[in-house]
Amino acid sequence: MAIGPKPESIIGSCDHPPQAEAQTGARLAAINGNNSPVSRLKDFTTDPWLTSTDQPQPGSTTNVPYSPPDSTKHARILIVGAGYGGLLFAVRLLQSGFTLEDILLVDSAGGFGGTWYWNRYPGLMCDIESYIYMPLLEETKNIPSQKYVSGEELRTHAERIAEKWKLGARTLFRTTVSDLTWDDNKLQWIATASCSSNERKQAGCTYTINADFAILANGTLSKPKVPDLPGIDDYTGRIFHTARWDYDYTGGSPAIPAMDQLRTKKVGVIGTGSTAVQVIPQLARWAGELTVFQRTPGAVGLQINRETDHAWWRDNVQLAGPEWQRKRCENFNAFITNPYRASLDAEDLVKDGWTKHPSFSVALGGARNLQADFLDLAKKIDKERREIGQQHINSTVRDPATAEALFNPTYGWCKRPCFHQGYFETYNRENVRLVSTPGQGITKLTRNGIMWGHQEFELDLIVLATGYELGSLCPANRARLSIHGRGRVSMSQKWASGPATLHGVMTRGFPNLFFPGTSQAGVTANQSYMFDRAAEHIAYIIQNARPRTAASAVNPKVRIEPSLEAEELWAMETVSRAKAFAATKTCSAGSYTISARLGESVDESQMARHMPWGEGMASYVKILEEWRKKRDMHGLEVVYD
């Protein structure tokens, strides 16, 4: 099938008037949310990767519910999450002097990896260079196979980290923490946890974990997000989300995604974001027919992948010496947060689409964001970027109407950019067509497929490539759990009037609780680097709060929290730099920026408190390092029992 016998009749031709992007938020609902079409999506909450039925122990990945042994019911430090973030927190704590027995990780997944555990769709890979994204490469002596490795390799690396530091014995999988409550008498957190199984006939179990310290290491890319799809119960075909891929239906496996069972199938994909950009070319290779439903075009740049040459690795990457990975990460950060390229006295080590996209610093913050000419310069270089992108699409996609629909004309800081090698070429295939629904989305699902306007598209399979539920900026809501601090005050209550933190990792009234930003903390495109700097800082705080006297052998309880003055001062320092993100207000309500996520109901002063550190990641890291060098724990109240 061609892109369409009359592409112009499909692309932007619906009788419905285009709707504003602001309507998008109301139509998006998280799985398990009140507006989810539960009857068809209930399978999305199960774990498709569990296979064994043996009785599990801590660290196992089986699917039978269990009661944890007594040793797991108390922990010095509870880490919620066992993806790259949780692993980094655990490793940095061990390196700071804590023992394995001090640490307990819990995760709702059946294994290590976080988003790389859940996501195993065809074409999955990192779009940040693997040499800087995969954590602890220096310590594990691992050499990634490619510049951008597959999801399978990313998950294997998580398991490698866990094995090296023996974290499997101190991890509870298939365990969900739903509530954290502070006990001010015992100076500890009481975590309500439940273990579960995919076997619905078996009941899960509920228990408590008492922890002296708690760290929220939940990532943002683990909970699938789906549109509120009218008519979903009428559809009789197969439907699943990319984060719960069904290889039994498509054929293939995560390691070898040869989807030979789709050769006679009509497949539809909803979405054209980062996930869709990776999965669409793979589906196009195998599906009999592929129809892509696009609400707004993705901002897709070119990604050139290559095998890692070991001689090059030795002579170029490791040549930087000790801490080479951190240096490479910080070189990357410098190039993506500085449109003033001539001022950078350094070589671009990563040399990819990210480092050629410095206007994205509008969304990340940077040392130059507060300069008077910054926005004009950002707009100028972003215009050049868009023109180059449009030329690439026009020269690649043969059908002019399709090429026009695939071009994203918005500023480069309003959407997270996507990168791929071969995405646009996919639309030249005879079995692929694009259905552009400008700013509106599909009309409804029918018994046989998808309706857009007055046209029905018959489909055997619908793949939801609709991303992940980011949640609110409140750490409790982002982690999808209830947190009550001193006086039973909920974190959501405190966040309602705008956050106050120390360094973006602690907040008063919630002692011994830590979280990795993003409000009032530094941010960058490389989330692993963000987690690592937070882990380094938090490990220092917990370790140095322990008493150093001989009497400390009895391990007295300790309460750590910011002083009221210190967290308010840090909040005001953040507010004073919030103008660095002023240009994000040019983005529509459907964008992923903080301004768009908070919405118009939040006033300017509150919004400024929610912003990241406006001077960028390098400035933020330097402030944390200088704070630690003073060794006085300034701004923290430390009380021993």
UniProtKB/Swiss-Prot annotation:
Residue numbers binding NADP(+): 125-127, 272-278, 295-296
Region (Disordered): 1-69
Entry keyword set: FAD, Flavoprotein, NADP, Oxidoreductase
Pfam families for the chain: Pyr_redox_2
InterPro entries the record matches: FAD-binding_Monooxygenases, FAD/NAD-bd_sf, FAD/NAD-binding_dom
Entry-linked PANTHER family: FAD-BINDING MONOOXYGENASE AUSB-RELATED, L-ORNITHINE N(5)-MONOOXYGENASE-RELATED
UniProt-recorded name of the protein: FAD-binding monooxygenase prhJ
Organism: Penicillium brasilianum
Record gene name: prhJ
